[in-house]
């Protein structure tokens, strides 16, 4: 069976997007692994399957698959690419600029600009330690963590996945490859943690590198950018709208404060289209 696909990327985070709204396709884990293989398949960080919505409140659904064939919950860069894909393929009614996309965890609101960036409602940050999860006696803006013989100060935030955020003087010389994995697997983070290294340039501009749990440093991490801005706001360093420069490019994050949702704006671009045989 031949399946049409679109290769897309957001800040260097690349995806193979498949239309399962208009073509019947349910790839198996083995087929997902083949699609994602950079030597023998198309190659990507994740495979996205656009599907009909199951809930009446949603316009479309989508499924996310990792290169090993397992299913993921949500991806900020991925949902931006999915929304751009749906619009480019003519699946979004003319004049519509806001969509509700169903994930396995809930609903995600997306705003489209004509041939430009995509804005995603990333939900409200979770700050209570048991729900991050993070072992601490009570919620605080900043925590101390003993790691590798030193005490580091960090913020702890969940954006649907856990994040630790450290402030550094210079992200270029930050110990991402050593301190990242040490914090990632620290016993106070029972489900491990993504680790962000944030350099504050101004109250509206930061640089960020993220060591992702189970993956190492990546070019871009949408939830990591959201967590960094939330933590920076709580610690009094940042304003409501912040430009976040990652190795793969720039995201713009808006967070008005406690109880409010985080909004992320960034690029979503088509690289090429093609067909792949799935046997």
Curated annotation (Swiss-Prot):
It comes from the Bacteria. One of its GO terms (biological process) is lysine biosynthetic process via diaminopimelate. It is found in: Cytoplasm. Pathway: Amino-acid biosynthesis; L-lysine biosynthesis via DAP pathway; DL-2,6-diaminopimelate from LL-2,6-diaminopimelate: step 1/1. The record marks 163, 212 as: Could be important to modulate the pK values of the two catalytic cysteine residues. Its EC number is 5.1.1.7. The record marks 272 as: Important for dimerization. Substrate binds at residues 13, 46, 66, 76-77, 161, 194, 212-213, 222-223. SUPFAM superfamilies: Diaminopimelate epimerase-like. It catalyses: (2S,6S)-2,6-diaminopimelate = meso-2,6-diaminopimelate. The active site is at 75 (proton donor), 221 (proton acceptor). GO terms for cellular component: cytosol. The keyword Phosphoprotein does not apply. Keywords: Amino-acid biosynthesis, Cytoplasm, Isomerase, Lysine biosynthesis. InterPro entries: DAP_epimerase_AS (IPR018510), DAP_epimerase_DapF (IPR001653). One of its GO terms (molecular function) is diaminopimelate epimerase activity. It is an enzyme of class 5 (isomerase). Belongs to the diaminopimelate epimerase family. Homodimer. Catalyzes the stereoinversion of LL-2,6-diaminopimelate (L,L-DAP) to meso-diaminopimelate (meso-DAP), a precursor of L-lysine and an essential component of the bacterial peptidoglycan. This is Diaminopimelate epimerase.
